[in-house]
Amino acid sequence: MNYLIGIDLGTSSTKTVLFDEKGEVIASASKDYPLYTPHNGWAEQKPEDWRDAALETITKVVKDSGVAADDIKGLGISGQMHGLVMLDEQGEVIRPSIIWCDQRTEKECEEMTEKVGAEKLIEITANPAMTGFTASKILWVRNNEPENYAKCKHI
C-alpha cells in the first residue's frame, strides 16, 4: 500500500499525519515550540524549532506506524505565511523569524506607502503596506539591525 505524509508547520506547533491511500489516518504526532515576544507587539520564532519539530514528528509517525519509508509516496507541507527567515551565504539562519502576527513595522509601512504611493502599492501588490507582511519586515531589519541586513543573502 502507498502512504502520504501531511505536515502543518503552525504558529504553536508542528502537526504531522501519515495517511494511507484511502485517506485513513495511520499515525499522527505533534510538537509544540515557543513564541518569543521580546517587546510588546513583537512575535518571533526560531526556524530551527520548526525544522526540528518536523524531523521529530516525521520520525515518530513512521516509527509508530511501522510503515516502510519506501512506501511513503508523497509529502505535503503547509506553513505560516509572511514569516521573515533571513539566511546568510552558507544558508544559516541569521536571526529569529519575525512572524505573521508581529506588529513592529508600522514606520516601515508608512515609508513604503510614502515612497511608492498607496494606489501604486495596491496596483503592484494587490495589498496596502501591512505590518504582517514580509517586505516591511525586511525594511525593519535594514533600519534597525544593519549588521543582520548586511549578512542576508537569502530570504
Question: Which functions belong to the PLM regions below?
Answer:
Residues M1-R95, E123, K151:
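N-terminal glycine/serine-rich phosphate-binding loop of ATP-dependent small-molecule kinases
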Residues L9-T11, K22, L121-I155:
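Gly/Ser/Thr-rich active-site cleft segment
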Residues P47-A54, T105, T131-T134, I155:
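Generic structural signal for well-ordered, non-membrane alpha-helical segments
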Residues I58, V62-G66, T113-G117, R142-Y149:
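Structural signal for hydrophobic packing residues in well-ordered secondary-structure cores
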Residues E89-V93, E111, K115-V116, K120:
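Hydrophobic or amphipathic alpha-helical targeting/insertion segments
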Residues D102:
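Carbohydrate-associated surface elements
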Residues T105-E108, G117, T134-K137:
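Internal, well-ordered alpha-helical segments in soluble enzyme and binding-protein domains
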Residues K107-E110, E123:
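Internal helix-loop-helix
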